[in-house]
């Protein structure tokens, strides 16, 4: 009897030691039972167990509490630079590069970075050569990818007053250089359908255009159609079969999984991330989303588009990031319900191999160097 009691006590002590250690050091979807999750903390433990990679964030600051969150969640981020002349902290590229290099150094391996080039210098005679020189320098500094943004196609015009598109001949040598270095192009071309109108307050992206009306093109003549912009993007894919491209924001095909699927079938060098478009998946029939993610589990990368802006309140940032990660994991990994837009959305409970790829493996495959 004493022997039995001793064994029980030893087992309990061993269990306590394991619990005290914290999250596992190796990625494992099975390390936690999703069905047993009853709190956001438990959900985040399950999220952390897979050692997730968020391939789409925008960081301008960091903080000891934020770094602690990254370490606790075993989370790696891809910090993406963007040139945007409407925002003071995105108007100049050099300060962004300097700041992100400092963030990378202070992150202890939790932050990687994606550079960009200045499309507002498109009219310069040396534009292409200068862009290649700059991104090559950034590759030497550790950049793992290059971003092109929606201002190509929706804002910047050439000397003839026409909107420049992603397949403009000036960009071709840049794409060739990215492919030559084995890097990845992160492509944000076009916007959700609602940007072309008519107004739809029920659309998940509607609030963005209330705050950023310059990108709402309804009843604004002279702008390219969404189809024109995406056709130019597709032309880049076809012309550059050796170039890995991640179409961010579900490749701006957020309302049609069938359209995304046809693109993934047509272009083997193309993948998509989920950044800022999870809400569109949430309002799509769960069985359709689940079937799509299982079939194309090698071609979808997890991303959020979360940001840490200058002078942001750290507590608000931590709450926003952690609640987003908890919601997304709960939706994709469990069969519990997620609340969105006043509705109860049934979780997808994706198979473990699919979760491993979407939250980690695909990022490592499609963006080498992470």
Task: Go through each PLM region and give its residues.
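Hydrophobic faces of well-ordered beta-strands that scaffold small-molecule active sites
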Residues: 53-57, 77-80, 113-115, 146-148, ...
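An N-terminally biased module of ancient metal coordination in phosphate/nucleic-acid-related enzymes
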Residues: 20-110, 129-130
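Active-site gating/metal-coordination segments in enzymes
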Residues: 45, 94-217, 268, 278, ...
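Positively charged n-region of N-terminal signal peptides that target proteins for export
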Residues: 1-4
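Bacterial N-terminal signal peptides
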Residues: 7-17
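Acidic-and-aromatic substrate-binding clefts and catalytic sites of carbohydrate-active enzymes
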Residues: 56-64, 84-96, 120-129, 156, ...
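H/E-rich (His + Asp/Glu) clusters that bind or coordinate divalent metals
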Residues: 31-34, 221, 226-235, 242-370
